[in-house]
């Protein structure tokens, strides 16, 4: 039997804005999304513009290591 490498992997996207360090907001935390990507089509780290509930605006979310 041949080894089957996972082509589609589950990744985590994290907000790049400093939501946790912003003292003006009442909510403190980090916005994270989980999604899947195809390793063959996108070998580099993924960056998507998603809504951050802590910043209350659309910000860039980058792929993080697990």
From Swiss-Prot:
Alphabetized GO MF terms: structural constituent of ribosome
Pfam assignment, any one: Ribosomal_L33
Alphabetized InterPro entries for the sequence: Ribosomal_bL33, Ribosomal_bL33_CS, Ribosomal_bL33_sf, Ribosomal_zn-bd
Keyword field: Chloroplast, Plastid, Ribonucleoprotein, Ribosomal protein
Chief location bin: plastid
GO cellular component: chloroplast; ribonucleoprotein complex; ribosome
Gene Ontology terms describing biological process: translation
UniProt-annotated location(s): Plastid, Chloroplast
Family note: Belongs to the bacterial ribosomal protein bL33 family.
Protein name, entry field: Large ribosomal subunit protein bL33c
Organism whose genome encodes this protein: Physcomitrium patens
Gene name of the encoded protein: rpl33
